Amino acid sequence: MLTNIAKKIFGSRNDRLLKQYRKSVARINALEEQMQALSDADLQAKTAEFKQRLADGQTLDGILPEAFAVCREASRRTLGMRHFDVQLIGGMVLHDGKIAEMRTGEGKTLVATLAVYLNALAGKGVHVVTVNDYLASRDAGIMEPLYNFLGLTVGVIISDMQPFDRQNAYAADITYGTNNEFGFDYLRDNMVTDQYDKVQRELNFAVVDEVDSILIDEARTPLIISGQADDNIQLYQIMNTVPPHLVRQETEEGEGDYWVDEKAHQVILSEAGHEHAEQILTQMGLLAENDSLYSAANIALMHHLMAALRAHSLFHKDQHYVIQDGEIVIVDEFTGRLMSGRRWSEGLHQAVEAKEGVEIKRENQTLASITFQNYFRLYTKLSGMTGTADTEAFEFQSIYNLETVIIPTNRPVQRKDFNDQIFRSAEEKFEAVVKDIEECHKRGQPVLVGTTSIENSELVSHLLQKAGLPHNVLNAKEHEREALIVAQAGKVGAITVATNMAGRGTDIVLGGNLKHQTDAIRADETLSDEEKQAQIAALENGWQAEHDKVMEAGGLHIIGTERHESRRIDNQLRGRSGRQGDPGSSRFYLSFEDPLLRLFALDRAAAILNRLAPERGVAIEHNLLTRQIEGAQRKVEGRNFDMRKQVLEYDDVANEQRKVIYSQRNEILTSKDISDLMQEIRSDVVSDLVDTYMPPDSMEEQWDIPTLENRLAAEFRLHEDIQSWLKADNAIDGQDIKERLIERIENEYAAKTELVGKQAMADFERNVMLQVIDNQWREHLAAMDYLRQGIHLRSYAQKNPKQEYKREAFTMFQDLWNGIKFHIASLLTSVQIEQNPVAVVEEQPIGNIQSIHSESPDMEELLGQSQTDLVTEAFNPDGTDFSPEALEARGQIVHRNDPCPCGSGLKYKQCHGKLA
């Protein structure tokens, strides 16, 4: 109550921000006539002027009014679109690093140009992030004439681009692309072995379109670059036969073998279930008599069993995945889109493949990963746009430090949102849905029907076919036709069935999207120019009449067949209607068989239903029920927020480690001289080794000199008689021994360096260091995954799992860093440099650098190999023959003192040439 009184007196935070922005709008509008008076050349010259002013010390905020005025006038001339005042406010919100909530149809794509142009003037690059390749290419294509007119370059990142093209796209002033591509490029850049293979620049400023979809809905989905791990494919097939023999419990405490917790999306084996599963596995010969699934030796069996149970109980065809070309393709539960190329982890994808009888592909091992939460927080400045952010404003603020500003519409919203209609059963609900669609179709009113799964969209489609109603289905299976179907969903009498929010980013124009239709005619090569003009003219004349007819029928009618877990998704569906002041309406049809009501609102809602006791087919509309449903949604939203926050808290630990590793890696890549770093590493490793066998402040009787000598000989090929040193000088201590050993190693290393040349040795060091870091980091990620999967069990010992995870992860990271230094020092000091007379061959380019990571050998194995093998595997992962005979047969010649064509950095006579 006090809050409401304060808002009435002082206005809300949103009101105060809008008031400030409107003052800037007035300054921009005051410049409009001045900009209109400029010639094209003078208007274009403004970009160079702004850049010079920034170089002279002026700020982006200082030139904002003029830059926005220039962008608006340039847009009017090149695109035929002038920014409204509310769009200017949206542009300022984006520039300030906030989220602009703008309703559907308010021109978010055009709004972005203002902030993008202003920030691109700084020359550090701007990324415009969209949800799919189509929208990235479309938006870049639409806005490129504007940016080019203003002297700025535009690049687009799409999934199948080559590295060289990606570099060019990122080098542009403005780069459009998807969240996945930006994130994966960041990870790939931190796996390269040559700094010139990187594609991204610094992460400066990003404008995220559909920011709620990317930063909220996909926040729990990490980006992972992986390679195949060793795995027993046959075990998935065998384990797939176990779940049908186990009995599912009706209730958590009921009889049976396992309980499916749909709320938490988990499967829990009961004590009886464990015993039953052990009996089955024993009969199959997978488990020894009287052995337990809990024993350490049977962890893999338990892993496969739980994966099979989850695949059978929680993941359903045409809801969570589809089968396409003999492969399991995941369906995004929020958008209904296919997520080609993505796979579930922890053996789940293989278990689903076994269940469906398709080819089982090996489990993957993580090489690099990052969540969207941590990737987007790497940008110096981040902003976003969406039609629905206010319900998640707290999460945006607490996790991303992004404030949400609600931008008023250019015209008042005329959409009517009717009360929910609730039925006893799903059958009654869908009958009412079809009846509503039929009535709309008769009066020519277009209808968009939203469903929460492919299964339901196909059910609605089947019912519409029975009723003889023509319609389009838009779900993951129709991804290619998505934009076309959505664009024409506003035609007279059109019926479109859409899974979730598929088609976001494409406006539904009442009367149909004229531009899409005219573009299709212009692209038709079978028509002559005269025929094209005639068809376009007829289309334009008929469009206005169709538009007016749809307006009279009430505009676009939205039907929701189910409430989503999040109110935001429901609002997105509603928001497809009533764009730019158009008429429209919306209504949700629910039943007590819907998952949301069944899982979260059943008890109290059922009591209300029993009191009202309607007849079959009669809907209930009651404020109590509506509040109960909204309460259930808030409960689920809170739970999902907690889960995302928990993911972030755990990933923050790995993120800090990732930053250190990537920073060190980048330093190695970019440094011309790493000799000081190498010297420091050798010194640290020798000191640690001596401290291990001659602990500081210990008695001489506690020293283990023989083992120290053996380790030095085995790991560093350093053969020193330390015991004779001690006999010769009673005053010698651990520090003296360290200094002598370090001196010996440095002298030998200096001799090697002189033999091959300082630059060649530096290149060799750099490549070995990067390979060691990548291998050790990969193993560390796997260990962190295992730690995280089991850390919750610490709570049974009255310990805080998060604190335990942080503590153990820190210890593991210290071990990782020590291991990296040890392997680098060991490998490089044990390298033997030989000189042999060799034939001469011609240099050829290095092979695919990326294969170093996918086929990199185990470092422990490398330690026991000869120098020739080491060089061959470290710098020639694909096994190309660089021997003199092979190169001569290929007609290639290299001089004996030239660099070896394998890319090791050594001279040919000291590398593959010595095989001769």
From Swiss-Prot:
Annotated catalysed reactions: ATP + H2O + cellular proteinSide 1 = ADP + phosphate + cellular proteinSide 2
Biological role stated in the UniProt entry: Part of the Sec protein translocase complex. Interacts with the SecYEG preprotein conducting channel. Has a central role in coupling the hydrolysis of ATP to the transfer of proteins into and across the cell membrane, serving both as a receptor for the preprotein-SecB complex and as an ATP-driven molecular motor driving the stepwise translocation of polypeptide chains across the membrane.
List of residues binding ATP: Q87, G105, E106, G107, K108, T109, D507
Keywords: ATP-binding, Cell inner membrane, Cell membrane, Cytoplasm, Membrane, Metal-binding, Nucleotide-binding, Protein transport, Translocase, Translocation, Transport, Zinc
Keyword Ion transport recorded: no
Subunit structure: Monomer and homodimer. Part of the essential Sec protein translocation apparatus which comprises SecA, SecYEG and auxiliary proteins SecDF-YajC and YidC.
Keyword Metal-binding appears in the UniProt entry: yes
Primary location class: membrane
Amino acids binding Zn(2+): C900, C902, C911, H912
EC number: 7.4.2.8
Family that this chain belongs to: Belongs to the SecA family.
GO terms under biological process: intracellular protein transmembrane transport; protein import; protein targeting; protein transport by the Sec complex
Compartment annotation: Cell inner membrane; Cytoplasm
Cofactor binding description: May bind 1 zinc ion per subunit.
Listed transmembrane segments: none
Leading EC class: translocase
Membrane-topology annotation of the record: Peripheral membrane protein
PROSITE patterns from the UniProt entry: SECA, SECA_MOTOR_DEAD
GO cellular component: cell envelope Sec protein transport complex; cytosol; plasma membrane
GO molecular function: ATP binding; metal ion binding; protein-exporting ATPase activity
Superkingdom, taxonomy of origin: Bacteria
Native species: Neisseria meningitidis serogroup C (strain 053442)
Cofactors: Zn(2+)
Cited NCBIfam families: PRK12904.1, secA
Protein name listed in UniProt: Protein translocase subunit SecA
